[in-house]
């Protein structure tokens, strides 16, 4: 009697594992079908599957701000402002002043008093 209970239990476990495998395969195949349908459905929807992010490369803000603030009379203030702007924008315009067209993010940051923040 005990041997029959063990055999029944093992059979039950094996059938449960097989059933769960079949269900996993079915859900996997249905996901593939819906994703392939949605990929070919519309041009705009395919962009969701092919997202590419264009991040600016990380720059050495300390070096870039040292170059930018080299001719200022208030170096600590310039370095602090330039460093926070560089960390946010990942760019610093060339030269010691001006040239903000090369980095529009850097040129558009303003203080609470609506003054340009970045030197």
Swiss-Prot record:
Keywords carried by this UniProt record: Disulfide bond, Gibberellin signaling pathway, Secreted, Signal
Entry annotated with the keyword Zinc: no
Residue ranges the record marks as coiled coil: none
Pfam family, one: GASA
Signal peptide: 1-24
Protein transport recorded as keyword: no
Functional note: Gibberellin-regulated protein that may function in hormonal controlled steps of development such as seed germination, flowering and seed maturation.
Protein name listed in UniProt: Gibberellin-regulated protein 9
